[in-house]
């Protein structure tokens, strides 16, 4: 069996699909150090530049002083601290939904929702470019799993009309992690109302970045209020929020159902309470950080203007995720390595993360970047393109 594994790994190398971990010597930042060498990084999902914010560092220390380091148990035993509880209440108020439930990761949150609600008699309708966690959750639930072409609501409507099921759940990224485009949330909620379905909205890359005060893809409070019975909102706390974790927000009966039936909630140790304590400060920074979101908009516009003349396709996106489509996996790796030789780190994204023939450089912007950083990246890419 071991020779089979070695052969499969070698095949992966030959196809340009082998992945390596990079060991950072310091905090997450637009400037990182790897093996003693400094890089200008466009890699992380630290969209607001909060991962190394002094106020969060102080909050973590204060949380450790008050709550210690570990939670020691699951939320359902003795691991649910005052910090966890206050964060859940603050998040519910922030996004405008009745209740929230904390999870250690977005993957666990998506798995919890789908497997707790759906079974063999049910149907899940999923955008073809959804995050892997949504796909894995759907498969594990044993529900019927129907995928529709990316953002194709005409096809989705036909599927909802023709496929009968006890329960129906539409699952979608709100901001698609590898393309940077957005799901039409209002239209999806309208379909849920028409066909008596739930919408699980994964806003991992929108929370903190989009909407008023960074409230994410739930930009219209009246729309949210009208659709509470149909809406299940998931967002992560390790991207724009700069810390770690995730939460699900929904009506009270939905949250209670997840507490009772979600295996990834009940059968795991709760995240360290010091993280929840720090996230209360993060939520304040997000709410008050209008200038950070404005800065991001400026950087996005600057980048798109400078990269339009490249021979590679810059996918349409108004979010911090700016994908540069190069096609083949080997070409993506070549460009990744050539940029690193110039002191710039932009990750090559290859199958199976993206479809075959759709390999890309995934440029991630942060409010911590400077305009000069974008200029440096642009100059390097134009040099590599021979422009």
UniProtKB/Swiss-Prot annotation:
GO BP, one annotated term: biotin biosynthetic process
Entry superkingdom: Bacteria
EC number in record: 2.3.1.47
Pathway info: Cofactor biosynthesis; biotin biosynthesis
Native organism taxonomy: Bacteria, Pseudomonadati, Pseudomonadota, Betaproteobacteria, Nitrosomonadales
Record function comment: Catalyzes the decarboxylative condensation of pimeloyl-[acyl-carrier protein] and L-alanine to produce 8-amino-7-oxononanoate (AON), [acyl-carrier protein], and carbon dioxide.
Residues holding substrate: 19, 131, 353
Name of the gene encoding the protein in the UniProt record: bioF
Protein's UniProt name: 8-amino-7-oxononanoate synthase
Gene3D superfamilies with a match to the protein in the record: Aspartate Aminotransferase, domain 1, Type I PLP-dependent aspartate aminotransferase-like (Major domain)
Organism: Nitrosomonas eutropha (strain DSM 101675 / C91 / Nm57)
N6-(pyridoxal phosphate)lysine PTM sites in chain numbering: 239
Binding of pyridoxal 5'-phosphate, residues: 106-107, 177, 205, 236
UniProt record similarity statement: Belongs to the class-II pyridoxal-phosphate-dependent aminotransferase family. BioF subfamily.
InterPro entries named among the record's database cross-references: Aminotransferase_I/II_large, AON_synthase_class-II, AONS_Archaea/Proteobacteria, AONS_Proteobacteria, PyrdxlP-dep_Trfase, PyrdxlP-dep_Trfase_major, PyrdxlP-dep_Trfase_small
């Amino acid at each position: 069996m071991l020779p089979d594994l070695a052969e499969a790994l070698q095949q992966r190398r030959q196809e340009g699909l082998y992945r390596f971990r990079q060991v950072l010597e310091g905090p997450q930042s637009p400037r990182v150090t790897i093996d003693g060498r400094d890089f200008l990084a466009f890699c992380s999902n630290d969209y607001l530049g909060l991962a190394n914010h002094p106020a969060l560092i102080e909050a973590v220390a204060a949380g450790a002083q008050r709550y210690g380091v570990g939670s020691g148990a699951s939320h359902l035993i003795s691991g649910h601290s005052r910090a966890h509880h206050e964060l859940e209440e603050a998040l519910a108020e922030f996004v405008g939904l009745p209740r929230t439930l904390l999870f250690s990761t977005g993957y666990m949150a998506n798995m919890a929702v789908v497997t707790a609600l759906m079974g063999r008699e049910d149907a899940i309708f999923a955008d073809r470019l959804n995050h892997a966690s949504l796909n894995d959750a759907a498969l594990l639930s044993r529900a019927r799993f129907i995928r529709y072409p990316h953002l194709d609501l005409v096809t989705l409507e036909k599927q909802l009309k023709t496929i009968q099921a006890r329960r129906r759940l539409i699952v979608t990224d709100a901001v698609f992690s590898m393309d940077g485009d957005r799901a039409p949330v209002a239209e999806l909620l309208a379909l849920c109302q028409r066909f008596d379905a739930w919408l699980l909205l994964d806003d991992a890359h929108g929370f903190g970045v989009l909407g008023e005060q960074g409230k994410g893809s739930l930009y219209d409070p009246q729309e949210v209020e009208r659709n509470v019975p149909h809406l299940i909102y998931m967002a992560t706390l390790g991207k724009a929020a700069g810390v770690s974790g995730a939460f699900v927000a929904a009506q009270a009966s939905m949250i209670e159902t997840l507490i009772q039936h979600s295996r990834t909630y009940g059968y795991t140790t709760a995240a360290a309470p010091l993280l929840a304590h720090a996230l209360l400060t993060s939520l304040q920074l997000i709410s008050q950080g209008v200038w950070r979101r404005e800065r991001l908009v400026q950087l996005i516009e600057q980048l798109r203007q400078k990269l339009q003349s490249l021979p590679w396709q810059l996918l349409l996106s108004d979010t911090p995720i700016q994908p540069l489509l190069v096609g083949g996996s080997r070409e993506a790796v070549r460009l990744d390595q050539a940029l690193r030789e110039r002191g710039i780190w932009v990750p090559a994204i290859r199958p199976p993360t993206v479809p075959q023939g759709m390999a890309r450089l995934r440029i991630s912007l942060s409010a911590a970047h400077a305009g000069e950083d974008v200029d440096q990246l642009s100059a390097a890419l134009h040099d590599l393109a021979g422009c």
